[in-house]
């Protein structure tokens, strides 16, 4: 009798678990300067943790944190203990499969914000470029992860501009944002926000944020992250600088959050800033933050230490847990935010502290570069190492005008072939030199570094080459190509349909239906908990079955 009375309830619970586990997290959408769940319009606050080994200064290798299912299985329960709903990952290997980790994160109610670059494929502040190689890297990450609805967004750059000496580099990052957004749209993927993560340099931070937020929506950042380390030890809203920062960004018009935070100048960290960040002084402007970082390393920023499959929580973990579980931020509905009509900020003017032009670098277009390369008679030899390119550039460009391959983001002047790859650009200037020397055979040698080829111009190339001009000083309108990426989409769940995130399913039983930061949200039954209930239920059924046999 007892079994008969329990069975319907247990079966119902098990059925609910199966349904919940299969349900995708609703995409997060942007309305005004806030994030919202797309399924019910409730506000979403980022309660995040940076999740990657800190080996990103290397130019060769990095560890993809989402390609190791065992590590994800080990770490996610600890992320859940501190109510994490976002992790930030800084570099991903598109040749790996991420299905298992992404599904485990999905089941735990955790979204990701992923950087599109990797250590040796990123925009270099000292020699900024937005070229075909970078475009293909960025779009390969998009192709790999677009299908997961728990991808909150992408960062197109991290601290690329970090002081007054390199503000021009921001133009290249903004061009990357423009073209990544255009690529997502052209591929028919769901709307996935693309933003930027900045350092907190007092001389440029306001202009930097305004630069990325301003202008046409097709080329502006969808959100802005600030790596904020001003609050150290015991401080306050005013003394920490949080008050002035909040005032600085109150009219930005797009979501802003701490893309890193957690000063460790005073240890152990108390994380008293958490209550302020999610309190009434800041939540109208800020949308939460991402604690730096999960793993303990030499930099002493870790919340846990790891040895193989074993995890040990540190004092910082316990302090953060105490603070983050005690927040109860106010929230609004997307409909109310939409009605408020938040407007975007205006672009900064060029000053001594800000020199990035609002005229952005051109879109990398493989067709244009291929047409140019095929039309050349003198080209760099295939056996020349890319390490030797700089010497050849220096020599040739000291003798001829290389403006056709150069990019000046201060004046907004860009050569027609500036987005092409290094080999194509070097061949172009070698050919210019060769032609200026009346095509003397000796002018296409460079000690064996150059060689002659048969030039050809396809009919489809004529318009490109004519617009660019012989010296590449003309203007050629590139277009976003959708057939350049070699990355394949992971087999994980998620919608790949086009259109706004708001077109997603109207219900989700695996995520909070209210504010992600509220205390009540923390008491919601998670999929993990329900799975345990189902397992217990099955055990009870088996046990009673054995008893009645």
Curated annotation (Swiss-Prot):
Carbohydrate attachment residues: 40, 59, 147, 163, 383, 408, 438
Biased composition (Low complexity): 487-519
Compositionally biased tracts (Polar residues): 336-356
Bridged cysteine pairs (disulfide): 72-101, 214-347, 232-263, 369-420, 378-444, 397-402
Record's keyword terms, sorted: Cell membrane, Disulfide bond, Glycoprotein, GPI-anchor, Lipoprotein, Membrane, Signal
Membrane topology annotation: Lipid-anchor; GPI-anchor
Keyword Hydrolase annotated: no
Protein location: Cell membrane
A Gene Ontology cellular-component term: plasma membrane
Family note: Belongs to the glycosyl hydrolase 72 family.
Name the UniProt record assigns to this protein: Protein EPD1
Organism: Candida maltosa (Yeast)
Lineage: Eukaryota, Fungi, Dikarya, Ascomycota, Saccharomycotina
